[in-house]
């Protein structure tokens, strides 16, 4: 797979079928007899092999793809990948009939993950996270967003984000970090949400920003978490620090989180099961991506589905992600996630594939760099042993990845 710097001379992948996922092109942007040329980690040509300019010089490396399909490298745009321990015991309690409240009273829930993360050092966090990252990468994932949110004080949020950043030194992958300090109340807050929001906006975000540990700021807007007014204070501080925002919105109730996210020009609003028409319209106007998370819906047995038809009608772009986390979506397969999005929520194959490539890149503010097979983008590719792209969504528990290329290597 090459070194972590991802630099190389000219490489050409020929005799391939391409799903370019180019923006503004119908469907998957398919090129039947295609080729891709890369240099210095960037795509310099993607299109019909017959139309490829004469690029080859001495030392050019050519790969015969033997008719395989090439898509952009997959992107998981919403994960909580860095955590310690697991919550399998809560899973057993819930199967035995315990309610969410009973689990929380027994010391479970997000607070359980906070306790575990605080007890672990940075090296331990990296070591525990790498197998989860490897599982994603084994399915052709080349970019992963990783949130904090189990530290909930300055030192532990920084530890979590530093561990996430270190993943990119350990593996050939692009990592985007998001500070989700406004995730839950830590035990020491003793139920005082206002004081904790003061801490997030006044201390945690500035401290994280000073060390450039976060690419974005997120929050959890929900009755069991933070109110729209509290999230607005967090987002005002993020804006002052020059950081883009994202939001866990309308998952368990409609607090108009989607509209709140849109009012701040959020990159994405995520979950969205209870989003209404006004929220969808606001997102469309703001260009905020709807990130669909079927893993959590499945795992906690939700019954209210995100309003996919509303998003289509208003032209809201949809991304699809694992929401990989220890409590509500212990999922590290983006391929299975696509199948869930199609089966549970009715997304089309084209929507699913766009959702883990182009629209996932858009949800991270990276569409100018990755997410499609176009000249000038990072040479992040996934090469598949399949007859047609629909197989990537249709099959379950099957991985047809032939090769994964990150920055040309």
From Swiss-Prot:
<keyword id="KW-0369">Histidine metabolism</keyword>
<feature type="binding site">
    <location>
        <position position="328"/>
    </location>
    <ligand>
        <name>4-imidazolone-5-propanoate</name>
    </ligand>
</feature>
<dbReference type="Pfam" id="PF01979">
    <property type="entry name" value="Amidohydro_1"/>
</dbReference>
<comment type="similarity">
    <text>Belongs to the metallo-dependent hydrolases superfamily. HutI family.</text>
</comment>
<feature type="binding site">
    <location>
        <position position="78"/>
    </location>
    <ligand>
        <name>Zn(2+)</name>
    </ligand>
</feature>
<feature type="binding site">
    <location>
        <position position="251"/>
    </location>
    <ligand>
        <name>4-imidazolone-5-propanoate</name>
    </ligand>
</feature>
<dbReference type="GO" id="GO:0019557">
    <property type="term" value="P:L-histidine catabolic process to glutamate and formate"/>
</dbReference>
<comment type="function">
    <text>Catalyzes the hydrolytic cleavage of the carbon-nitrogen bond in imidazolone-5-propanoate to yield N-formimidoyl-L-glutamate. It is the third step in the universal histidine degradation pathway.</text>
</comment>
<feature type="binding site">
    <location>
        <position position="78"/>
    </location>
    <ligand>
        <name>Fe(3+)</name>
    </ligand>
</feature>
<keyword id="KW-0408">Iron</keyword>
<feature type="binding site">
    <location>
        <position position="80"/>
    </location>
    <ligand>
        <name>Fe(3+)</name>
    </ligand>
</feature>
<comment type="pathway">
    <text>Amino-acid degradation; L-histidine degradation into L-glutamate; N-formimidoyl-L-glutamate from L-histidine: step 3/3.</text>
</comment>
<feature type="binding site">
    <location>
        <position position="327"/>
    </location>
    <ligand>
        <name>N-formimidoyl-L-glutamate</name>
    </ligand>
</feature>
<dbReference type="GO" id="GO:0005737">
    <property type="term" value="C:cytoplasm"/>
</dbReference>
<dbReference type="GO" id="GO:0005506">
    <property type="term" value="F:iron ion binding"/>
</dbReference>
<keyword id="KW-0378">Hydrolase</keyword>
<keyword id="KW-0479">Metal-binding</keyword>
<feature type="binding site">
    <location>
        <position position="183"/>
    </location>
    <ligand>
        <name>4-imidazolone-5-propanoate</name>
    </ligand>
</feature>
<dbReference type="GO" id="GO:0008270">
    <property type="term" value="F:zinc ion binding"/>
</dbReference>
<protein>
    <recommendedName>
        <fullName>Imidazolonepropionase</fullName>
        <ecNumber>3.5.2.7</ecNumber>
    </recommendedName>
</protein>
<dbReference type="InterPro" id="IPR011059">
    <property type="entry name" value="Metal-dep_hydrolase_composite"/>
</dbReference>
<dbReference type="GO" id="GO:0050480">
    <property type="term" value="F:imidazolonepropionase activity"/>
</dbReference>
<feature type="binding site">
    <location>
        <position position="325"/>
    </location>
    <ligand>
        <name>N-formimidoyl-L-glutamate</name>
    </ligand>
</feature>
<feature type="binding site">
    <location>
        <position position="323"/>
    </location>
    <ligand>
        <name>Fe(3+)</name>
    </ligand>
</feature>
<keyword id="KW-0963">Cytoplasm</keyword>
<feature type="binding site">
    <location>
        <position position="248"/>
    </location>
    <ligand>
        <name>Zn(2+)</name>
    </ligand>
</feature>
<dbReference type="InterPro" id="IPR032466">
    <property type="entry name" value="Metal_Hydrolase"/>
</dbReference>
<dbReference type="GO" id="GO:0019556">
    <property type="term" value="P:L-histidine catabolic process to glutamate and formamide"/>
</dbReference>
<feature type="binding site">
    <location>
        <position position="323"/>
    </location>
    <ligand>
        <name>Zn(2+)</name>
    </ligand>
</feature>
<dbReference type="InterPro" id="IPR005920">
    <property type="entry name" value="HutI"/>
</dbReference>
<feature type="binding site">
    <location>
        <position position="150"/>
    </location>
    <ligand>
        <name>N-formimidoyl-L-glutamate</name>
    </ligand>
</feature>
<feature type="binding site">
    <location>
        <position position="150"/>
    </location>
    <ligand>
        <name>4-imidazolone-5-propanoate</name>
    </ligand>
</feature>
<feature type="binding site">
    <location>
        <position position="80"/>
    </location>
    <ligand>
        <name>Zn(2+)</name>
    </ligand>
</feature>
<dbReference type="InterPro" id="IPR006680">
    <property type="entry name" value="Amidohydro-rel"/>
</dbReference>
<keyword id="KW-0862">Zinc</keyword>
<feature type="binding site">
    <location>
        <position position="87"/>
    </location>
    <ligand>
        <name>4-imidazolone-5-propanoate</name>
    </ligand>
</feature>
<feature type="binding site">
    <location>
        <position position="248"/>
    </location>
    <ligand>
        <name>Fe(3+)</name>
    </ligand>
</feature>
């Amino acid at each position: 797979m090459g070194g972590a710097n991802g630099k190389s001379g000219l490489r050409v992948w020929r005799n391939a079928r391409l799903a370019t996922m180019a923006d503004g092109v119908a469907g998957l942007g398919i090129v039947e007899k295609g080729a891709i040329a890369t240099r210095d980690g960037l795509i310099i040509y993607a299109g019909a092999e017959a139309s490829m300019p004469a690029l080859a010089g001495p030392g050019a490396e050519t790969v015969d793809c033997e008719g395989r399909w090439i898509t952009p490298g997959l992107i998981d745009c919403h994960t909580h990948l860095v955590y310690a321990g697991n919550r399998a015991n809560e899973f057993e309690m819930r199967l035995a009939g315990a309610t969410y409240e009973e689990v929380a009273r027994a010391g479970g829930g997000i607070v359980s993950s906070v306790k575990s993360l605080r007890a672990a050092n940075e090296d331990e966090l990296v070591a525990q996270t790498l197998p989860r990252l490897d599982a994603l990468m084994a399915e052709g994932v080349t970019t992963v967003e990783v949130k904090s949110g189990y530290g909930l004080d300055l030192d532990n949020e920084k530890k979590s984000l530093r561990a996430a950043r270190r993943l990119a030194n350990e593996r050939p992958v692009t990592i985007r970090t998001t500070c989700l300090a406004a995730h839950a109340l830590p035990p020491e807050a003793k139920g005082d949400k206002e004081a904790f929001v003061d801490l997030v906006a006044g201390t945690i975000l500035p401290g994280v920003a000073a060390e450039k540990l976060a690419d974005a700021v997120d929050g959890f807007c929900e009755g069991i978490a933070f109110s729209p007014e509290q999230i607005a204070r967090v987002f005002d501080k993020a804006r002052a620090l020059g950081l883009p925002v994202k939001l866990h919105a309308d998952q368990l109730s409609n607090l108009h989180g989607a509209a709140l996210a849109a009012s701040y020009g959020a990159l994405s609003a995520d979950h969205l099961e209870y989003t209404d028409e006004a929220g969808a319209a606001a997102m469309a106007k703001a260009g905020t991506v709807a990130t669909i998370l079927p893993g959590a819906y499945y795992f906690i047995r939700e019954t209210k589905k995100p309003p996919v038809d509303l998003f289509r009608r208003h032209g809201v772009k949809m991304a699809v992600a694992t929401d990989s986390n220890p409590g509500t979506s212990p999922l590290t397969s983006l391929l299975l996630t696509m199948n869930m999005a199609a089966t549970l929520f009715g997304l089309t194959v084209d929507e699913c594939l766009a959702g883990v490539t182009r629209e996932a890149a858009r949800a991270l503010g990276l569409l100018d760099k990755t997410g499609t097979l176009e000249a000038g983008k990072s040479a992040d590719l996934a090469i598949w042993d399949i007859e047609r792209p629909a197989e990537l969504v249709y099959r379950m528990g099957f991985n047809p990845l032939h090769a994964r290329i990150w920055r040309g290597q």
